[in-house]
Structure formats: C-alpha cells, structure tokens
C-alpha cells in the first residue's frame, strides 16, 4: 500500500508553462471561431443587402422606362412631339491614331483617358465635356449608352484601378474596399452610379479602368468621315449601342 501511494506521489505534475500554453491555445481557438462566425454573418448580411439593392435598382429602371413611354404617348395624344431630357451620359471610343495631331487634341484625349485605339470611357455630359468631345471628334465615336450597354461593359470588360493596378472586378469586395466610403459596395451600385450619373459619378468613373474593346465585328467603314455622312467618327447618339455590341 505504502509503495503504491509513493508511486502516486511520484507522478509528475503538469508544468505551469504547459497549462498556460493550453489555456492560451483554447482562448485563441475560441477567438478564431468567434471571428469566423462574425465574418460569416457579415457576408450573409452583405449578400442580403446587395440583393435588396439590385431589386430596388431594377424597380427604379423599370419606372424610368415606363415614365418615358407614358410621356411619349401623352405627347402623341395631344398631337405634339415628345422631346426626351438631355442625355447626361456618353460613352466615348477612340477609333484612330494620333500621329501628327496638334498638342491640344493629344491633351484632350489624355484627359478623356483614351490613350489607345479602341479604348472606351464614360463621360458626364456638360458644356465643358461637350466642347472637349468636339475638339477630338474626328478621332472618336461617341453616343448615349443605354442600361444594357452600361451593364454589359462593366460586367464583361470592367477592371478597377486598385493601388494603381488594373484589377478584374471578379468580387464585390474589391469594389467595397475602394468605393465603400461612398456607399458603392457592389457591381449593381457601380452600374447605377454610372448610368444615372449620380453624385459620386466622378469617383466611380475614375475607379473604372478605361475599357479595352475589341476591333468591331465587320470592321469600320470610314474612320475619317463623320457618322452622319456614312462614316464612323463623331456623335452617333443612341446608335453607339450597336457599335458597343460589335466591340464588346
């Protein structure tokens, strides 16, 4: 009996340092699990918010379209012509090289971020930007993009400027990190801000890298001739959407 008791006494106790390590490890594991759970809940809440926003925007776009149709019908009924509101958004595509052009033209193309042939950018239309477009009109094709064009360009060709690098917009988190402070956290927010020319259009547009479009299917007709004369250059109004389809 005495020998057995002596053996029991001789069993080495767990060192305090090991106990402390185990306790710290257990606490760390709990913290990690809590953080993981919190992140999961945050992702779930964000997905729900993005879904609700997309639903709201869809309703808003449908309402805008219906209002246009109703106004046109009312004008026809009264025997008048319906004149839509002045477009606020343009999509501009560079279609020619600039060898031998004036420094002014070169500078305007740089300001429009059209450094290469078949680069495209969104432009907010106002007096100053329209004057800029007139200066470089022989070198660009431009017009008024519809919702489908804005949507397809951003989803298919959209790249963001993140840390001065061209990054594909494959995840809403990339948008949220760069534009979250402006309330733009997903692709639908970005599309809405561009299409409606919202208060944060400048930030949203500067975030988007200039679009690199393909050579148009079927080729160009006459790059040096204006669109109204059967060429490719200049303002083609809503016909820009056809060109976007051929190049996207």
Swiss-Prot record:
Gene3D superfamilies: Ribosomal protein L30, ferredoxin-like fold domain. Sequence repeats lie at residues 7-18, 19-30, 31-42, 43-54. Coiled coil: none annotated. GO terms for biological process: maturation of LSU-rRNA from tricistronic rRNA transcript (SSU-rRNA, 5.8S rRNA, LSU-rRNA). The modification Phosphotyrosine is found at residue 139. It is found in: Cytoplasm. The modification Phosphothreonine is found at residue 17. Keywords: Acetylation, Cytoplasm, Phosphoprotein, Repeat, Ribonucleoprotein, Ribosomal protein, RNA-binding. Residues 7-54 are annotated as: 4 X 12 AA tandem repeats. GO terms for molecular function: RNA binding; structural constituent of ribosome. GO terms for cellular component: cytosolic large ribosomal subunit. Component of the large ribosomal subunit. The ribosome is a large ribonucleoprotein complex responsible for the synthesis of proteins in the cell. Binds to G-rich structures in 28S rRNA and in mRNAs. Plays a regulatory role in the translation apparatus; inhibits cell-free translation of mRNAs. Component of the large ribosomal subunit. Homodimer. Interacts with DHX33. This is Large ribosomal subunit protein uL30. It comes from Bos taurus (Bovine).
């Amino acid at each position: 009996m005495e020998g057995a008791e002596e053996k029991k006494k001789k069993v080495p106790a767990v060192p305090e340092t090991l106990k402390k390590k185990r306790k710290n490890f257990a606490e760390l594991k709990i913290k990690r699990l809590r953080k993981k759970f919190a992140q999961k809940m945050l992702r779930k809440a964000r997905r729900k918010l993005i879904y609700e926003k997309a639903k709201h925007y869809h309703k808003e776009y449908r309402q805008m379209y219906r209002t246009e149709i109703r106004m046109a019908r009312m004008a026809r009924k009264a025997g008048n012509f319906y004149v839509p509101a002045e477009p606020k958004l343009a999509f501009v595509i560079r279609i020619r090289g600039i060898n031998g052009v004036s420094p002014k033209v070169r500078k305007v193309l740089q300001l429009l971020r059209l450094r290469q042939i078949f680069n495209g950018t969104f432009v907010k239309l106002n007096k100053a930007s329209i004057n800029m477009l007139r200066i470089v009109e022989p070198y660009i094709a431009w017009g008024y993009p519809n919702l489908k064009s804005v949507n397809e360009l951003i989803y298919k060709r959209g790249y963001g400027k993140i840390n001065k690098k061209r990054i594909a917009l494959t995840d809403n988190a990339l948008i949220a990190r760069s534009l979250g402070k402006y309330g733009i956290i997903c692709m639908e927010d970005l599309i809405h801000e561009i299409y409606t020319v919202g208060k944060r259009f400048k930030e949203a547009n500067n975030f988007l890298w200039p679009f690199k479009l393909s050579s148009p299917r079927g080729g160009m007709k006459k790059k040096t001739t204006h669109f109204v004369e059967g060429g490719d250059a200049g303002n083609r109004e809503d016909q820009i959407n056809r060109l976007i389809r051929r190049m996207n």
